[in-house]
Amino acid sequence: MTDVSDFIDVSDPAALEDAVARAREVLADRGCVVLPTDTVYGIGADAFSPLAVAVLLAAKGRSRTMPPPVLIADRRVMAGLAYDVPEEAEALAERFWPGALTLILKSQPTLTWDLGETRGTVALRVPDDAVARELLYAVGPMAVSSANRTGMDAATTADDARSMLGESVALYLDAGPRESRDPSTIVDCTVTPFRVARQGSVPLDELRAVVPDLLAEGEEPPVAAERIAAADDAAAARPADREA
C-alpha cells in the first residue's frame, strides 16, 4: 500500500472497471477504501481480515466496542453470514433490500472473522448503489462504516471523507455528492419483539407494515394483559393491612 491516497472519479461508468480492480488490490493489502453508498459515503475494508478491520476502526478513531456493519452484494449472501434468521427478518430483507435498512442477526459461528465486540451478531445490509454493489460483487462482503472520524458529521462527498480521513485511506471512489446525511435504519432481529436500534432513512411505519409489533428506538415492550390481570388478582388476594 502506498503512502499517498488514490482518488478515482467513478461517476463515469467507463472508469468503474479500473476502479474496482484498484480497490481489489487495496483490500487484498488490508487497506481501506472510501466508497459511495445509497446513504452517505462509507469507509470499507475486507470483512474477513481482522487487521483490515482494525485499520478501519483506527482510521475512524473508534474502539472495538463499536463494530462496523457488513455490506453484501445481494440477499443470497445473508445465509452464509447469519444463521437462525427469523422469517420476519427475511421479510424485511425481501422488502427493503437493496436499500437503507441494516439488520442485526446472529452471526454464523463458523466464520473466521473479527469485527470487534459483536457478541455473536452481525449487522448486514445490501446498499442500493451501483458502484458499491459492483465492488461488493467483485470482492465479497466488506466491513463498512460511515466515512468520518467518530463524532464528526458523515461525509456526503468523497472530498468530505478525504478531509477527515486523509491518508489513512488508500483509495477514494468519488461518485458525486449524496443527497442526505441520513444513515440507514438499524433493526435488531436477535430480540423478541424486533427493535429499532437506530432510526434512519427507512420510516418506522413502513417497517411496521412488514413487522407490526416492531418496537421503535427506545420503546419498551408493552406489559402483556395477562400479566397485569395476574398482578391485580394477587393484590386482591393479599389480606388488608391492619392499622397499628
Predicted regions and their residues:
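Active-site-adjacent structural elements in enzyme catalytic cores
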Residues: 1-244
